[in-house]
Amino acid sequence: MRVLITGASGGIGAACVQRFLDEGHEVVGFDLLPTAVEHERYRHLIVDVREPNSFPGDLEPQVIVNVAGVQDSADDIAANLRGTINVTERYAFVGEGLATKPAPAIQSVVNVGSASGH
């Protein structure tokens, strides 16, 4: 299964990356920061979830895990809410308006939140 994880360089995101790799999945990580993860089934991309025009088009994930977020920032709504919406709209759905439907490959979308990112 191909899993897309946003916030892949942070604590929860990095743990998710490792867990999915340990379970044999192909993982794509989005983050503004680099990662120390080196694995044949891992692809790390420096991506800002607030900027959907920067998203690569060739991913077709079956699972999306939205972990990316910032704390105590003027951008918290843009990153924590809009970023999650941007990624989910781009990879979990096809079509526009009333014709929107789930992407054929998508099986699950997981949105992670914490008290610090409220």
List where the protein language model places each region.
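Conserved glycine-rich Rossmann-like NAD(P)H-binding loop of the short-chain dehydrogenase/reductase
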Residues: 23-37
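Residue(s) in the substrate-gating loop at a strand-loop-helix junction
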Residues: 114
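A short, exposed helix-loop element centered on a Lys and neighboring polar residues
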Residues: 88-89
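Conserved Rossmann-fold cofactor-binding substructure of NAD(P)-dependent oxidoreductases
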Residues: 43-61
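Helix N-cap/beta-alpha junction loops of NAD(P)-dependent oxidoreductase domains
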Residues: 71-74, 118
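N-terminal Rossmann NAD(P)H-binding glycine-rich loop of SDR-like oxidoreductase domains
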Residues: 6-23
